[in-house]
């Protein structure tokens, strides 16, 4: 699968916008992404290794909920990680 990073996440991946990861599930892909780009780990995952709710995941344009991270994914899937922005 290919992870596509944008916005403030780029600085944690040495400004690499796309990172290809070989993994059977999105959960495994996130773990391997954090191994490949260690500075992303504390940004994407909490102390228990769970995906932080401040971010949203989209696979091939469709939002994926946290409960779906263990579902099988294909090698050609494109995963976008978007940071939710709030303010006033």
Q: What do the PLM-derived regions correspond to, one by one?
A:
Residues 1-87:
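Ubiquitin-like/PB1-type beta-grasp interaction modules and other compact soluble beta-rich domains
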């Amino acid at each position: 699968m290919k992870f596509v990073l944008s916005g403030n996440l780029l600085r944690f991946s040495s400004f690499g916008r796309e990172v290809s990861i070989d993994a059977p599930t999105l959960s495994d892909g996130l773990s391997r992404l954090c191994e490949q780009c260690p500075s992303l780990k504390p940004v994407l995952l909490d102390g228990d290794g769970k995906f932080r709710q401040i971010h949203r995941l989209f696979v091939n344009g469709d939002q994926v909920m946290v409960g779906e991270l263990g579902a099988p994914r294909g090698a050609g899937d494109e995963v976008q990680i978007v940071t939710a922005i709030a303010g006033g």
